[in-house]
UniProtKB/Swiss-Prot annotation:
Domain PDZ positions: 288-384
Domain of life: Eukaryota
Classification via InterPro entries: DEGP_PDZ (IPR041517), DEGP_PDZ_sf (IPR046449), PDZ (IPR001478), PDZ_sf (IPR036034), Peptidase_S1_PA (IPR009003), Peptidase_S1C (IPR001940)
An example Gene Ontology biological process: proteolysis
Protein name in UniProt: Putative protease Do-like 11, mitochondrial
UniProt source species: Arabidopsis thaliana
UniProt entry tagged with the keyword Glycosyltransferase: no
Function: Putative serine protease.
Length: 560
């Protein structure tokens, strides 16, 4: 008589009573049953899980008779699954043999609470709903707390941050001293001596070797998980779209782990920033050094150009590269780049600071590893120079190029201070990209059209980038304001990067602007941070209010 095991069946499959470590997706195949030779061989997929026995109802007459085939008689594990389980056993053995964390390490880890109000991207004079965020941080030298930028979210007057020590119920007020959204890091200051009592700063270590065991610390009530280092490479940070060095680990990342330290041997080897990914210590040290040296908001250099690999021998021959030469081909150099008008399209970059670049766009790194060449540039600060060796028309040249800051894929005003804006004719002009906040050159775009008869028919200009005002190339938002305020022609003409044109009657647009401000309860045509020469004088001097520039008037009245 056939013995039918007692199992908990879910659908066509049941749960196997095997160790959780062996849980994995695999393929199994039924074999001829000892009770009947009529069963065919069928291949299907299943999952070994923690409870019960895996069984499969036969698709033939045995199924009609309700016969269940035990796992031992009907399934064979494939070789790949066995090897995978052996790797898992080795992994867990390595993790179990690792040393527990020192209690002093845990005492240096804190909980971070942040509440921030963002400004509207399209209407920068308006604030949006308050957002709350929680994460982890840890003490570093100088009575500072290091955490993720996305945990504190912003660095402005509308951001409020509290921290709480491990095992304590008291929250302490913190101030964001420095934030870098490029590398997703922020430094907090806490003035309370009580908070720092008995807290030791954690020491920063080096990049961990592959397959080394690391501990991830953070989350609610200090959760500790362990895993192995899988790879070290440059990677696009999702938060900022910056291409920087990163470490991938297989340790479980729990809720609110962001900003927590990754520990190896009681030293910090990284900061958690995404699920499975860690900011390595070279990036952390570079960020901290930049904080001490400068108040710049960007601390990573960039050549700001487009390029491609040269792995195909035909393209290398076309550009007269010798057999031993390797490098990358420049496709485009952006006008904001320090290499603009120095390097050229179709130049071959052979080396940076004496380090040869491979045809695969990579350079040598630690322990025979290779990473993207951008690492050489990003680990320099904006304003520093890089020695770039290029091949041009078969001849080699070297240039010292001043690096520009990395430009993340977001508008700076959202994160740092009260947004900059200027309104004219119902069009809202804002900075387009993140550079230095005091940069002499940045792009300007239209973020919103406040509907009015004066701007009817110009709906397609939303998001358009301004190139010229009355034939003069626009340098930045302040320059655009000056060009519009000082307009002496009957018509104001704006030209855009997409080749579209905006023409407004200047006097009519000025009158319409004041009406638009009152209609939308906007206090000013211009943000406070943009200081035009015409606004520096006392507007009530000699009571000559009628001689004031027209745009000063909204600054005197509160329409709310």
């Amino acid at each position: 008589m056939f013995f039918r095991p007692c199992v908990h069946t879910v659908g066509r499959y049941s749960r196997a009573r095997v160790p959780g470590l062996l849980s994995s997706l695999f393929f199994y195949r039924s074999c001829n049953n000892v009770l009947t030779n009529s069963l065919p061989t069928v291949t299907t997929a299943g999952r070994v899980s923690r409870y019960g026995y895996i069984c499969r109802r036969s698709s033939t007459s045995a199924a009609e008779r309700g016969v269940f085939l035990p796992f031992a008689l009907t399934c064979r594990r494939n070789i790949h699954s066995i090897h995978e389980d052996e790797k898992k056993l080795e992994r867990w053995k390595k993790i179990e043999e690792s040393h527990p964390l020192d209690e002093l390490v845990l005492d240096s880890v804190v909980k971070v609470f942040s509440n921030s109000t963002e400004y509207s991207k399209s209407k920068p004079w308006k604030t949006l709903d308050q957002k709350s965020s929680r994460g982890t941080g840890f003490a570093i030298a100088g009575r500072k707390i290091l955490t993720n930028a996305h945990v504190v979210m912003a660095m402005n007057d509308h951001t409020f941050v509290d921290v709480k020590r491990h095992g304590s119920q008291i929250k302490y007020k913190a101030k964001v001293q420095k934030i870098s959204h490029e590398c997703d890091l922020a430094i907090l200051e806490i003035d309370s001596d009580e908070f720092w009592k008995g807290m030791n700063p954690l020491e920063l270590g080096d990049i961990p070797p592959l397959q080394e065991v690391v501990s991830v610390v953070g989350g609610e009530n200090i959760c500790i998980t362990k895993g192995l280092v899988l790879r070290v490479e440059t990677r696009i940070y999702d938060y900022s779209d910056s291409d920087l060095l990163s470490i991938q680990i297989d340790a479980t990342i729990n809720d609110e782990n962001s900003g927590g330290p990754v520990i190896m041997g009681n030293k910090v080897v990284g900061v958690v920033y995404e699920i499975g990914f860690v900011i390595p210590t070279p990036i952390i040290k570079h960020f901290i050094t930049s904080v001490q040296e400068s108040r710049q908001y960007s601390c990573f250099g960039s050549l700001d150009l487009s390029y491609q690999s040269l792995e195909n021998v035909q393209i290398r021959n076309h550009f007269k590269m010798s057999h031993e030469m390797t490098g990358i081909l420049i496709n485009k150099i952006n006008s904001s780049s320090g290499a603009y008008k120095i390097l050229r399209k179709d130049d071959i970059i052979l080396a940076i600071d004496g380090v040869p670049i491979g045809n695969d766009e990579k350079v040598p790194f630690q322990n025979k590893r290779r990473i993207d060449f951008s690492y050489l540039v990003s680990m320099k600060k904006p304003g520093e120079k890089a020695l770039v060796k290029v091949l041009r028309n078969g001849k080699e040249y070297e240039y010292n190029i001043s690096l520009k800051p990395v430009k993340p894929n977001f508008t700076v005003q959202q994160f740092y201070n009260v947004p900059s804006y200027y309104i004219f004719g119902g069009f809202v002009f804002v900075p387009l990209t993140k550079t230095y906040l005091d940069s002499e050159h940045h792009q300007v775009k239209i973020s919103e059209r406040l509907a009015d008869d004066i701007n009817e028919g110009y709906q397609s200009l939303y998001g358009a980038q301004v190139e010229k005002v009355n034939g003069v190339e626009v340098k930045n938002l302040k320059h655009l304001c000056e060009l519009i305020e000082e307009c002496s022609t009957e018509d104001l003409r704006l030209e855009f990067k997409n080749h579209k044109v905006l023409v407004l009657n200047y006097e009519s647009a000025k009158k319409a602007t004041l009406q638009i401000l009152e209609r939308h309860k906007i206090k000013s045509v211009i943000s406070k941070d943009i200081c035009l020469p015409m606004l520096l004088d006392d507007p009530f001097k000699d009571n000559k209010i009628n001689l004031l520039p027209w745009s000063v008037l909204p600054l005197m009245f509160d329409f709310s």
